[in-house]
Regions:
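Gram-negative bacterial Sec-dependent N-terminal signal peptides
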Residues: 1-21
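N-terminal maturation segment of proteins
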Residues: 24-604
Length: 604
């Protein structure tokens, strides 16, 4: 179509023809300035929104914020389980979505564009949970606020206890725990009415924890531990006031609330709990589980697809068992190798928990000499190694807690040793690579040191976090840490656990498997004794979908590495690949894939 000129356009053309040269140059310059101003405005609006979003998250759930290293709200517990607070939080999220979509993404700098995409993903994911009443299930054997705060009492966890302010902050939380318990009881009563209750099996496992928290007198309470460990540097007045405060709070507020909770669980809640196993037995349970799967894997994989991936991985790893078994002196069928290993006394060499910790410390020292060849980007924050507090040992597994961003707490690898004579040695190398370095510590401590918005510095997703840690285990082979067949078996056995999780999690929550089916499958495939298979199964019952992120995330990172190696050939650098993966903190897997693909294209 032939263009036409209006009178207005002709007049403009005439004016431009007669204008001085400087005026012609001023127009583009003015346009650029306006565009730059708009871009700056978008950047300011985005940064303001990102800060508000994270602060809202931290205030809504201050305990989780503290676990992630943000100690600003260590005197608060939040009341995220209160229905009105939950509704208000979802309303906030909806407002944030509107504000986010009003910002021009293309006007942002590349790193802000990534943050924009992550925030968009997080908000959409959070809002998918709105129809499902998670607040009606505030307690399980795996986690609850009373047990978390009890674990903080020694000052070694995510709640520091070194200053008067710290002691007051923890006491403040104890004062708020009674109302939280009463809200939890009210929620669970509502859950009973609506058919949203926990499986009876996991609550029977949880009950002893809560009975144990009820003390005969304040001084016997685990929550009184800080008052028994007041630093000598505190003034006499502060010591007296703090001790009196802890004693009064426990006697008049906390202990009665804990007694109410234990009695409610035993006499009212557990009798009303369901005998079914999976999440799909709940109202809207299958839809609820699908949202959990998407959240935990950051993918659109369906349960059946994940189930089949798990079965395929189980078969692959059993093929490796067949190869490594004879090197360990085992000549039976491959599937029986884990059971045989458990029966060998030589793989249970410990007499004390300190001996276990000493092996990890030796391994940590060894890694300090090997990791620089694989990583140029490493955290500055140190990693400490500690034994798990006694209260939580029965239900805890070895794990990592992040450092405090203010430097008051290092990253910590916690070793859970219930009975040192039964602590197996074959899995120690791969476990430490996962929970310590270069697994969780390299990822999470480094993320806190990067120049990122707080919602990324302290946030994340399960598929990347656990996927990276499981991928980190595979690096043991390149560092020569699996040269002994028993150590390589330990790595394979941990891989097998993550593959089995894909099978049993989807089996129980999407395919109608019973608790007993899962226990039997784990015993046959992993060689676990009944007690361990039961506790693992009950973990997946309490945390539907959580165990899926490990293998799904790890497989994606390995896929991306193989893609980069094939595309770049001699130009491929493993330290650079690790920098690309870790260099912007946690990403949903789709965004990680785009980032690696860009690096491949730029590096060719």
């Amino acid at each position: 179509m032939k263009p036409t000129l209006t009178l207005g356009a002709l007049a403009c053309a005439a004016m431009l023809a007669c204008a001085p040269a400087g005026a012609l140059e001023a127009k583009p310059a003015a346009a650029k300035a306006a565009a730059s101003a708009n871009a700056n405005a978008d950047a300011r609006r985005f940064n303001k929104l990102a800060d508000e979003y994270y602060d809202a998250l931290a205030r809504f759930d201050p305990v989780s914020a503290g676990e992630s290293g943000d100690s600003r709200f260590n005197d608060q517990i939040g009341m995220s389980i209160a229905p009105k607070n939950r509704a208000a939080q979802f309303a906030l999220y909806k407002g944030y979505v509107k504000r986010l979509h009003a910002i021009h993404r293309d006007a942002l700098a590349p790193r802000d564009q990534t943050s924009y995409d992550i925030l968009d993903y997080e908000l959409a994911t959070a809002l998918r949970f709105e129809p499902f009443p998670e607040h009606l299930l505030p307690i399980s054997q795996m986690d609850s606020l009373p047990v978390m705060l009890a674990n903080y009492a020694g000052g070694e966890g995510a709640q520091p206890l070194s200053t008067v302010k710290d002691y007051r902050a923890y006491l403040s939380r104890l004062n708020q725990l009674g109302p939280w318990i009463d809200q939890a009881i009210a929620n669970m009563r509502d859950g009973v009415k609506r058919g949203v209750v926990q499986p009876k099996a996991i609550m029977l496992s949880a009950l002893p924890q809560f009975k144990q928290l009820v003390a005969a007198k304040p001084e016997d309470s685990i929550y009184y531990t800080p008052a028994k460990k007041l630093p000598a540097s505190f003034s006499d007045a502060d010591k007296k006031k703090l001790a009196a405060g802890y004693r009064a709070t426990i006697e008049h507020k906390l202990n009665p609330a804990l007694a109410r909770l234990a009695a409610f669980l035993e006499n009212e809640y557990i009798p009303a709990c369901r005998t079914s196993t999976g999440w799909s037995a709940l109202p809207q349970g299958m839809d609820w589980y699908l949202v959990r799967v998407a959240s935990q894997t950051t993918t659109d994989l369906q349960p059946e697809q994940i189930h089949q991936i798990g079965l395929k991985e189980v078969a692959r790893i059993q093929g490796e068992y067949a190869r490594i078994g004879p090197q360990m002196g085992y000549t039976g069928p491959a599937a029986g190798l884990p059971t045989w290993v458990l029966e060998q006394p030589k793989y249970k060499p410990f007499k004390t928990e300190q001996e276990v910790l000493d092996v990890y410390r030796k391994l940590n020292a060894q890694l300090k000499t090997k990791l620089p060849a694989l990583f140029t980007l490493r955290p500055k924050t140190p990693l400490d190694l500690r034994l798990e507090p006694e209260l939580s040992r029965a239900t805890a597994s070895d794990h990592y807690t992040p450092p405090a961003v203010d430097g008051t707490r290092p990253g910590v690898f916690w070793s859970v040793v219930n009975d040192p004579t039964q602590y197996g040695s074959t899995g120690m190398v791969t476990l430490f690579l996962h929970e310590g370095q270069p697994g969780h510590h390299f990822h999470i401590a480094l993320m806190q040191e990067l120049d990122l918005p707080n919602f990324r510095k302290f946030g994340g997703n399960n598929a990347f976090t656990e996927g990276w840690a499981l991928y980190a285990e595979t690096l043991g082979k390149e560092m020569g840490l699996f040269d002994k067949p028993e150590d390589y078996f330990g790595h394979l056995n941990d891989e097998m656990l993550r593959a089995v999780r894909l099978v049993v999690d989807t089996g129980m929550h999407a395919k109608g498997w019973t608790r007993e089916q899962s226990i039997q499958y784990m015993r046959e495939t992993l060689g676990y004794p009944e007690s361990i298979a039961r506790s693992e199964t009950e973990r997946y019952m309490a945390w539907p979908g959580q165990a899926l992120g490990y293998k799904i995330g790890s497989l994606k990172i390995q896929e991306l590495r193989h893609r980069a190696e094939a595309a770049l050939g001699s130009k491929f650098s493993l330290p650079k690949f690790h920098e690309i993966v870790l260099g912007e903190g946690t990403l949903p897997l789709a965004l990680l894939e785009k980032k690696v693909d860009r690096w491949i294209a730029e590096s060719k």
